[in-house]
Amino acid sequence: DDAAIAGAVTLVARKGGQAHVRAYGMADRASGTPMRVDTIFRIASMTKPITSVGIMMMREEGLLALDDPASDYLPELEDREVLVSVDTATSSVVTRPASRPITIRDLLRHTSGIAYGFSSHEAQALSRYAGIAPRAQPILHDPGSRWTYGMGTAFLGWIIEEISGQSLSE
């Protein structure tokens, strides 16, 4: 009632069923659209734990192992190079071979070297000056050597799609 949030949906699950489900408030205040129990929400980074659980379920089912090279499922990750430098004046990029392949575990732990463009100056430079799309950029460090917040979870989602033959939303 104090308008702190526009709307919400609550659900209580008990004994395999829904004991309670209810919509409150507005899905869109500006248009006056009421919240419904089937309103679709943008959940942003909450997809990370959901995708990670999907990967762990596939591991439990024996469909993959955490130390599998990610390139076994996504060939585009094979032989990823590590960024050494980006010359913003000439748009030239210097890379070197990675010490080892990126694994599923690296993608789960954000230790793959794959960065978001907004999370590192190097990744921004690769996009802005060298014109390299994020999905094709060299990695920022050797896999497993350090933590870098990045789009590894997106690659995990693509791995789920590859193994399951379904889109992640399914």
Protein language model annotation of sequence segments:
Residues 1-15:
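Beta-lactamase-like hydrolase cores
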Residues 57-64, 160-169:
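Bacterial peptidoglycan biogenesis and beta-lactam-recognition machinery
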Residues 9-13, 23, 42, 65:
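Short, conserved beta-strand segments within well-ordered enzyme catalytic domains
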Residues 144-152, 164, 168:
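Short, contiguous, pocket-lining structural segments
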Residues 28-148:
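Active-site-proximal loop and beta-strand segments within enzyme catalytic domains
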Residues 103-110, 152-162:
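Active-site-proximal alpha-helical segments within enzyme catalytic domains
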Residues 17-18, 63:
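Residue-level signal for well-ordered, solvent-exposed loop/turn and beta-edge residues enriched
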Residues 18-25:
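Amphipathic coiled-coil signal-relay and dimerization helices
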